[in-house]
Amino acid sequence: MRYNPLAYIRSEKDILKLVNALILNTKGEGEKSSEDFWVKAERLYYSALIGYIWYEAEPEERNFITLLDLINASEAREDDEEFQSPVDILFAKLEKEHPDHFAVKQYRKFKMAAGKTLKSILISCGARLSPFDIQELRD
């Protein structure tokens, strides 16, 4: 039997609760309990991605594996602010169709950071979720 936390989302408030639980329960030893810039930035990105998955993905793709795949497809380049990753392209398309979409609003806030900062945020997101990105969970 598998547990899919995204299956319990019914509202945007639930997305935020899930993101809070994810951050709280993956805090490393020695990590400060006060929330710094990096954690807040991660929170924005997770909210955007989970919002996208919940609203836009096919029912069978509304799961943690899709979240991991989106994070793995994310990229920022310090030397090229115009570069667009596959995830950037997904959100650009969604923004054209639905500029007030919950996920788009979260993503816009996340993308306010410069390339070097975005890269650091993405590394933090990848590091936080790396224990879940194993074949056993994908099967």
Residue ranges and their predicted role:
Residues 1-139:
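P-loop NTPase motor domains
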